[in-house]
Amino acid sequence: MAEEDDSPIPEERFTPEPDASSSPEGAPGNGGLDEDVALAINGQYIKDLSFEAPHTPEIYNDLQTEMPEIKVDIDVGAEAKAESLFEVMIKCRAEARIDDKLVYLTEIEYAGLFTINVEPEALGPVLLIECPLILFPFMRRIISDLTGDGGFAPLMLSPIDFAALYQQRMMQA
């Protein structure tokens, strides 16, 4: 049996209070955040979501003996909403098939609203690389939960190289 610890709980805070010297000039009372932060996420949300498994429950018999072929397509996009305010979207389509029979199809458009204050030449990489990197883990969890809740093994998407996607897009432009 463990001994009880009778040591008093310290009265000081575990996280120090910010003092005036830790706050950027011109930013009193904002918790130390600069008003011209290069990137801030204002919110994130599902814009569109669908899941289809048209051959359940019969497909479960096929899954006992065969592994489905899974094809995943990812695309990113961005749209200006106001000055320094951008909506960034990741679209993902995942399709599982055994031969020509659809096991499941899921599509999601996951988005975030970002305030971005960077030089114009840096805007493209921030919108199409940095912002999707922030959104991707949340979208990945939704897809995993959705396929698992659909009665299948959860689909765990591999990390996406958004920098390579961006470079590919620039070469095609």
Model-derived regions, located:
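N-terminal intrinsically disordered, cationic/polar leader segments
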Residues: 2-134, 141-173
